[in-house]
A protein has these predicted regions:
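Extracellular loop-to-transmembrane helix junctions
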Residues: 28-43, 47, 100-130, 150
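Interfacial loop-to-helix junctions that mark the boundaries of transmembrane helices
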Residues: 27, 178-192, 217-218, 262-268
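Helix-loop-helix module between adjacent transmembrane segments
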Residues: 38, 118-134, 138-207, 280-284
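Membrane-interface "cap" regions at the ends of multi-pass membrane proteins
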Residues: 23-24, 37-94, 301-304
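Hydrophobic alpha-helical segments and their helix-loop junctions in multi-pass secondary transporters
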Residues: 166-170, 174-183, 192-194, 205-206, ...
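Juxtamembrane helix-boundary/capping and inter-helix hinge elements in multi-pass membrane proteins
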Residues: 100-106, 131-137, 144-149, 296-306
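Hydrophobic, membrane-embedded alpha-helices of multi-pass small-molecule transporters
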Residues: 75-92, 235-242, 253-326
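Selective recognition of specific alpha-helical transmembrane segments in multi-pass small-molecule
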Residues: 34-44, 158, 162-166, 222-239, ...
Length: 328
């Protein structure tokens, strides 16, 4: 609680020194308030959610009961957190919030409310269901509690959705990498090269035991994403021009700027419902449930479910807020 208050106090003091216009002051204040709410949500709301799930640190996890050196491999909780964070984050909390920035600061509000009340809870219970059901996937759990027909439906539905998500998660990074200036006039500037390379990596990461590729490289990439997000946030603060006072938050709405917060889309597109389907990753995304079994099979204690699953989604919310602010 004290740390959250210190962060908010620092943010407001910073704004009083370094912001320039009432419009920018308002956006930055909303940003710091959102970060504080995310941290407070993890500190106070996530223990309540954990209590409802009936987590028991004394029972054996699937990793201890089914350890076979392939999928059920013990992973340190910090590594597990970074892997889960990278699994759910990717390009989603970057592209979505940047597009959602067209709707103004209300995008930040949606990310925070969706994350604390929906996304983080969803991810946490996805992990809970999997670890309580021997590390099974969502279709397998559905088949266990319903019937084989429903299991088949869930398998087909999940496969279709993952196909479309997979296409985006292949084409997007391939396009970014092939357009880098350092690869100009080389084979690496070919988009097809990166598509095939990413596909090959996907197959290897899927077929090989989890401790061969995923546990070695994912934590590094997850840490790099956190460092990148922090660097962007610091850059936004450093490059912000000189501001008057944090009290501009109220003055901003007293002036003729309320429309910037409520309906700023340049194409006149309505906030409801388009904002909520523009920004999913960072706020709430059902696709995250497909990633839950990967780490649920590797946790050595149920007490790690909350920091790994709820914590990873909270961090994704912070990533979304930073990119939304950059877009705004």
């Amino acid at each position: 609680m004290l740390r959250s208050i210190v962060i908010l106090k620092f943010g407001l003091q910073y704004l009083a020194l370094y912001t320039h216009t009432k419009r920018e002051a308002c956006f930055m204040i909303i940003f710091f308030i959102c970060l504080t709410i995310l941290i407070l949500g993890y500190k106070f709301y996530s223990p309540f959610v954990e209590k409802q799930a009936g987590m028991d640190s004394t029972v054996d996890t699937p990793q201890k009961r089914f350890s076979e050196g392939v999928d059920y491999v013990a992973i340190h909780p910090v590594r597990a957190f970074l892997i889960q964070f990278l699994n759910i984050a990717g390009v989603g909390p970057i592209f979505g919030p940047i597009l959602g920035a067209l709707y103004g600061p209300v995008a930040l509000v949606w990310i925070v409310l969706g994350n604390v009340l929906g996304g983080a809870v969803h991810d946490f219970f996805s992990g809970v269901m999997s670890i309580k059901e021997d590390g099974k996937s969502l279709p397998e759990i559905a088949g266990h509690y319903y019937n084989v027909v429903f299991k088949g439906f869930m398998l087909i539905f999940t496969a279709m959705l993952l196909f479309f998500v997979g296409v985006v998660f292949i084409m997007s990074p391939a396009g970014l990498l092939s357009n880098l200036d350092i690869f100009k006039d080389t084979i690496f500037a070919n988009n097809t090269f990166w598509v095939l390379a990413i596909l090959a990596y996907y197959f290897l990461a899927t077929l090989l035991p989890i401790d061969k590729i995923i546990t070695k490289f994912y934590p590094i990439f997850g840490l790099l994403m956190i460092v990148m997000t922090v660097a962007i946030a610091v850059s936004l603060l450093i490059n912000a021009p000189h501001l008057p006072v944090a009290g501009d938050f109220l003055a901003y709405f007293e002036a003729d700027h309320a429309h910037d917060f409520l309906a700023p889309n340049p194409d006149g597109l309505p906030t409801w419902p388009l904002l909520f389907i523009t920004i999913t990753c960072g706020a709430i995304s059902g696709f995250h449930s497909t990633q839950a079994p990967i780490i649920a099979r590797c946790l050595t204690n149920e007490k790690y479910v909350r920091p790994v699953y709820y914590g990873a989604m909270m961090c994704e919310g912070i990533v979304g807020c930073v990119w939304a602010l950059a877009g705004i």
